[in-house]
Design a protein with these regions (language model features):
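Long, low-complexity, charged/polar intrinsically disordered regions in eukaryotic proteins
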Residues: 1-12
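N-terminal helix-turn-helix DNA-binding core of bacterial DNA-binding proteins
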Residues: 13-50, 73-76, 80-85
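Conserved segment of winged-helix/HTH DNA-binding domains
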Residues: 35, 75-111
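Key DNA-contact positions within bacterial/archaeal DNA-binding proteins
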Residues: 53
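Short, hydrophobic-biased segments on the C-terminal half of alpha helices
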Residues: 59-60
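Glycine-centered, phosphate/nucleic-acid-interacting loop/turn motifs that mediate DNA/RNA or nucleotide
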Residues: 66
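Short beta-strand "wing" residues that participate in macromolecule-binding interfaces
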Residues: 70
Length: 111
């Protein structure tokens, strides 16, 4: 897999990425896709040992964060399969990068 570097300089984007990866199931999903390549939901759920509905929730969160992509395809027998693949990424999170990202947060601090 070719790695690309995405700059997570926007505060909201950085929060979405960190939140998406802060769950052990989602980390396992990214790992399975990174190692095994693109896969469809049913097979991926079996591979990592969680239910399809739960996997759908985690894939949605990962897709919203831009860490995975999906593509609906027809199988040989005419069934629609939703394939997921990991988006190549590399992030370097430094204190300076966090400070810059914090300047662009849209959420107001709680008082």
């Amino acid at each position: 897999m070719k790695e690309t570097i995405q700059s997570a300089t926007e505060g909201d984007q950085l929060l979405a990425i960190l939140a998406a990866l802060a769950n052990p199931h989602r980390m396992r999903v990214v790992a399975a896709l990174a190692v095994g390549g693109r896969n469809y939901v049913s097979q991926l759920a079996r591979d990592i040992g969680i239910s399809r509905p739960l996997l759908h929730l985690h894939l949605q969160k990962l897709e919203e964060a831009g860490l995975v992509t999906s593509k609906l395809e027809l199988s040989q027998d005419g069934k629609a399969l939703n394939y997921f693949d990991v988006t190549p990424f590399a992030f370097q999170i430094t204190p300076a990068a966090v400070a810059e990202a914090a300047k662009t947060l849209t959420a107001k601090p709680e008082t």
